[in-house]
Design a protein with these regions (language model features):
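Non-heme di-metal
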Residues: 1-178
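Positively charged N-terminal leader segments that act as targeting/secretion signals
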Residues: 178-192
Length: 193
């Protein structure tokens, strides 16, 4: 199929359905904010259907591998975005006088680098059998019910909600950083407690 019009059409269909899905999701959010729940639900339902159409074409032209393979592919895509795509777009935007858009391209480029690093770390965890185990005790949290378990390994099954080990992650504790945030940020945080 490589190099055929059908391959090009499959990629175009995937891109079109993917863009429609995102667009309809944005429209659903706007309709909901404006008080049109039924219209929001229809936009969201259509977005979900467009996702399934996109998946159909993507499976034909690319396929969906195992998690490790998908992490490699995702990291490569993020690498391209932060090392090539966004820097080129930022340069061109700046040359055309769109300084603010160039700055946005550069800012998103930095986020894509974080995405690549995250995918690489997750791949390392998968390859080393460290997704659900660690060398030292840590706090594992069930992503379904919030149950906490202390140990070197996540439990095979959550004793509270009976969800499998797959639902456990190391408990994130990034909210401790709030104390080190700039004064204005701390003030905003205190408004929402």
């Amino acid at each position: 199929m490589k190099g055929t019009k059908t391959e090009a059409n499959l990629w175009a269909a995937f891109a079109g359905e993917s863009q429609a899905r995102n667009k309809y999701t944005f429209y659903a959010s706007k309709a909901k904010k404006e008080g049109y729940e039924q219209i929001a639900a229809i936009f969201q339902e259509t977005a979900d259907q467009e996702k399934e159409h996109a998946k159909l074409w993507f499976k034909q032209v690319h396929g969906i591998g195992g998690t490790a393979e998908n992490l490699v592919d995702a990291a490569a895509g993020e690498n391209y975005e932060w090392t090539d795509m966004y820097p080129t777009m930022a340069k061109e935007a700046r040359e055309e006088g769109f300084v603010e858009i160039a700055a946005l391209f550069e800012a998103v480029s930095r986020v894509e680098k974080v995405h690549e690093d995250r995918y690489k770390k997750l791949l390392e965890n998968v390859q080393n059998g460290m997704v659900f185990s660690r060398n030292e005790e840590c706090v594992w949290q069930c992503r379904n019910c919030g149950h906490l378990h202390v140990g070197k390994m996540a439990p095979e099954m959550c004793p509270v909600c009976a969800h499998p080990k797959a639902y456990f992650q190391i408990k994130p504790e990034n909210y401790g950083l709030i104390e080190k945030a700039p004064r204005g940020a701390l003030f905003l945080f205190s408004l929402y407690r």
